UniProtKB/Swiss-Prot annotation:
It comes from Streptomyces hygroscopicus subsp. jinggangensis (strain 5008). Keywords: Antibiotic biosynthesis, Kinase, Transferase. One of its GO terms (biological process) is antibiotic biosynthetic process. Transmembrane segments: none annotated. This is C(7)-cyclitol 7-kinase. Coiled coil: none annotated. Belongs to the ROK (NagC/XylR) family. SUPFAM superfamilies: Actin-like ATPase domain (SSF53067). Disruption phenotype: Cells lacking this gene are unable to procduce validamycin A. It catalyses: valienone + ATP = valienone 7-phosphate + ADP + H(+); validone + ATP = validone 7-phosphate + ADP + H(+). It is an enzyme of class 2 (transferase).
Length: 351
């Protein structure tokens, strides 16, 4: 019989984050990324003294250079398209509105897809990084789901009826900037605000909180598994040691983590109550480093907050971790590019 399928398409995929730029190759529609190169991003983290516009230019020069180097590889067909995952809010037509972790303050709106198309001479698909990560799970998750990344910050996207739920101008999916602490001295957010969810429940926020707790209660800190690795110095506590202590059941670490996760539980409860999504996937370095401990403590707090109409079992069943790797954005942007660029063609297949 004759069926429609997508012609294979070799892509260069890139994930531009505030800390690291990852570039690799993928066949659109597959989940196998290869020839991945990781380099420090030439942005705010490395050149913080430069003006935002200069940093934006520097980042785009680096992105163009690294992608161009992957267009042709020994023993492989030339790439036919490019797909880029970008750490920042983006409009539906690929214009980056801000890059707080990349170039900090205000810079010109960046039509990243158009710029790269002009420079590289190939079709380019661009999307926000959390949007890209959500696309990795689109085929495997038959029901609507919310993907949340919990790393140095927090971001989310809801995938429903085959698309990401965001406004054409890119609004939506920025739950990390939801105000949850109204105190004037609340934890600072990278956007310049204070008391945002991402400043409290992220890996960075949770580390800030456990260090503050250690400084405030020296005796409890001294009894904690965190005291040894840090030499008894609160500011020497690391995320790695914090996650290890929490996984091992250390009371001090777990209670501090629990407090940090409470506003995230409130966010999940709000999303469920508002739009009825019953599947929440969590990725990001901090969440995945904590593993089942993250789900247990977040589940405890979600049960305490409550999800209207659900019992404890159904409430906890909504939470799950994504794959334990750092390829979410590379794989996901490849899947998104296949959906946008893949041209259907008729092929003969055996029934």
């Amino acid at each position: 019989m004759t069926a429609l399928t997508l012609a294979p398409c070799d892509l260069v995929v890139a994930d531009l984050g505030g800390t690291t730029l990852r570039v690799g190759r993928i066949t659109a529609g597959t989940s196998e990324v290869h020839d991945v190169k990781r380099v420090p991003t030439n942005g705010l983290g490395r050149y913080g003294a430069l003006a935002p516009q200069e940093l934006q230019d520097r980042v785009m020069e680096q992105l163009t250079r690294e992608i161009a180097a992957h267009l042709t590889r020994p023993g492989q067909a030339p790439a036919q398209a490019v797909a880029v995952s970008f750490a920042g809010p983006m409009t539906a037509d690929g214009v980056v509105l801000a890059g707080p972790t990349l170039w900090g303050g205000p810079a010109a709106p960046l039509p990243v897809a158009d710029v790269l198309t002009q420079r590289l001479g190939l079709p380019v698909v661009a999307a926000n990084d959390v949007t890209a990560a959500a696309w990795r799970y689109a085929a495997a998750e038959p029901e609507p789901f919310c993907l949340t990344t919990v790393s140095s910050g927090i971001g989310n996207k809801v995938f429903r009826h085959g698309e990401i739920v965001i406004d054409q101008l890119g609004y939506g999916g920025e739950i990390g900037h939801w105000l949850v602490d109204h105190a004037e001295d609340a934890a600072p957010c990278e956007c310049g605000g204070r008391g945002h969810l991402g400043a409290i429940a992220s890996g960075r926020g949770a580390l800030f909180a456990v260090r503050a707790a250690a400084a405030a209660d020296a005796s409890a800190f001294a009894r904690s598994a965190l005291a040894g690795p840090s030499g008894g110095v609160p500011e020497a506590i690391t995320n790695e040691a914090f996650a290890a202590a929490a996984r091992a059941g250390d009371t001090f670490a777990r209670e501090s983590l629990r407090r940090s996760l409470r506003p995230l539980a409130s966010a999940v409860s709000l999303l469920f109550t508002a739009i009825g999504v019953r599947r929440y996937l969590f990725v990001g370095g901090f969440a995945l480093a904590l593993g089942d401990t993250f789900l247990t403590l977040l589940g405890d707090e979600l049960v305490r907050v409550g999800c209207f109409g659900l019992d404890e079992y159904a409430t906890r069943a909504m939470l799950a971790l994504g794959e334990d790797d750092d390829d979410h954005c590379l794989i996901g942007i490849g899947q998104l590019a296949a959906a946008r660029l893949g041209a259907p063609r008729a092929v003969e297949v055996t029934a």
